[in-house]
Amino acid sequence: MTAQQETRPSAATKPARWAADIVTAMREGARLRLDYSVRSLWSVDRTIEDIRREAAPYAAVETVLRGFGAYAGEVIVRQSGGEWWASGGDHWVRTPDGRFWAPVDEARRCYTGDGSLRLLCRDASRR
């Protein structure tokens, strides 16, 4: 266990795992390398758009969207020094300025054509 894992709140456990899973799945299945950078979120937004254009049923992509949202949340946590919060099965990122962000919900909005994980991260990282 690394020092980072030891000090992370328990609310981070599931989203961190979902993010790691999507990084692995994209590397192995789509040959897309995600490196937890803000820049990588452009590729994530584009991938979600491609999935949407294929008209895949939501139920078929729900887990992938959750993974992409968790990945974006991890980018925000790493960029801003924020932390994951959880309640009632929902997960948010709280940035040091006290604002809350819902990257998993934003990934779902991306799938409907109304969101952007890249822009969410940009806004969350502004102080």
Language model features with spans:
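N-terminal low-complexity, intrinsically disordered segments
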Residues: 1-62
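Small-side-chain structural scaffolding
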Residues: 10-11, 15-20, 69, 73, ...
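Enriched - but not universal
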Residues: 21, 45, 87-88, 95, ...
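Amphipathic, interaction-prone secondary-structure segments
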Residues: 55-98
